[in-house]
């Protein structure tokens, strides 16, 4: 069962009954992230009190779980992912360690693992994935979109096996000769090309890093979100299928707290970003992430509508037709890679809106 049994029902005096999760949720709600602390994965840090306990050996942070600053009577433990878990995918980690209640699983990954390690996403922490293709405007004057970049023949550096690239070439947006899967995330190849190459990245990271942190380049990049072309998985918090029933009462109270946390972060990201940067420094893992990049990421997520309301006006909701299209689009791509998507997979198999409070939304 996720970390401990349901917590003691004797709630502390400071716990408001309106937001109390005590006795309903596990006493410690464990959230597995997909990387070291960064603004993209803001939501569990947004819910965590700033005076928690840092475990530098296993790269985790445990603190009181707060609902807009109010103590809920349970704790949250946020675990770093990526190299901190041996570069294992989050669902694999969730299946190995049943103490993990929630993990970051984008819906394309949910589709990919639907027959082997299925998960169900219970809230979309962001409406769009921040995945981009970026390029130098100086080297590619007049190129404003990925499809225009496709007409230049420029090499596009990307992580080999990324399914969105199979989609972009299959749809004729990029030519099959353009992708170079040898990219490892370091700037060396891009810099060596003098900016003639384009590269995969995140709207929340590379445009800032190449302008401010890559001393060999130190110039801005132009970019476009891959989701603009119809490859648009949701970044989401997911759980194992059996937990949907087992923790239904918990999720009914927790998910609206998460939704409000998204709204609160969009309005005032500073305190959470400060916690994220502090944890990066304390983990001291070789991952570099400073306050400038965190602030840039928070601002970009709002301005690029990565953090946004869903079409129905609710923050955190999934759109079934969008997920259906993604399933249709990905099935042949994964089949080519020898991965079998569950037969007859529906959006309801991998996502649910049942725990959302439809009244919670971003202003505007």
Where are the predicted features?
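Short, glycine-/small- and polar/acidic-enriched structural segments
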Residues: 12-184, 197, 201, 224
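Short, solvent-exposed loop/beta-turn-alpha elements that line the ligand-binding surface or hinge
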Residues: 53-71, 223-225, 229-230, 245, ...
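Pocket-lining segment of extracytoplasmic ligand-binding domains
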Residues: 108-109, 183-286
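Small-molecule pocket liners
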Residues: 127-133, 137-139, 233-237, 242, ...
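Secondary-structure end/capping motifs
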Residues: 247-337
């Amino acid at each position: 069962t996720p970390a401990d049994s349901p917590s003691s029902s004797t709630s502390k005096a400071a716990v408001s009954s309106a937001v109390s999760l005590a006795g309903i949720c596990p006493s410690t709600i464990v959230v597995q992230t997909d990387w070291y602390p960064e603004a993209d994965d803001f939501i569990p840090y947004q819910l965590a009190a700033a005076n928690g306990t840092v475990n530098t050996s296993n790269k985790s942070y445990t603190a009181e779980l707060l609902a807009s600053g109010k103590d809920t009577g349970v704790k949250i433990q946020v675990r770093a992912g990526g190299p901190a878990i041996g570069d294992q995918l989050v669902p694999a980690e969730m299946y190995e360690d049943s103490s993990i209640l929630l993990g970051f699983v984008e819906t394309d990954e949910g589709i990919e693992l639907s027959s082997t390690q299925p998960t169900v996403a219970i809230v979309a922490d962001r409406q769009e994935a921040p995945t981009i293709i970026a390029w130098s405007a100086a080297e590619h004057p007049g190129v404003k979109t990925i499809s225009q970049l496709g007409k230049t023949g420029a090499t596009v550096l990307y992580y080999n096996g990324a399914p969105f690239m199979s989609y972009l070439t299959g749809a004729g947006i990029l030519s099959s000769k353009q992708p170079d899967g040898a990219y490892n995330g370091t700037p060396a190849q891009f810099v060596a090309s003098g900016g003639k190459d384009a590269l995969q990245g995140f709207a929340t990271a590379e445009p800032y890093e190449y302008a401010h942190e890559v001393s060999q380049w130190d110039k801005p990049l132009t970019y476009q979100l891959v989701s603009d072309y119809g490859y648009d998985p949701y970044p989401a918090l997911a759980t194992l299928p059996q937990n949907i029933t087992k923790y239904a009462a918990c999720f009914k109270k927790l998910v609206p707290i998460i939704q409000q946390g998204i709204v609160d972060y969009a309005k005032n990201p500073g305190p959470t970003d400060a916690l994220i940067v502090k944890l990066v420094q304390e983990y001291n893992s070789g991952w570099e992430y400073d306050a400038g990049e965190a602030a840039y990421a928070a601002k970009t997520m709002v301005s690029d509508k990565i953090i946004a309301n869903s079409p129905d006006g609710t923050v955190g909701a999934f759109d079934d037709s969008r997920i259906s299209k993604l399933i249709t689009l990905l099935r042949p791509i994964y089949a080519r890679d020898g991965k079998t998507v569950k037969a007859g997979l529906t959006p309801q198999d991998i996502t649910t809106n049942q725990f959302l409070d439809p009244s919670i939304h971003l202003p505007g």
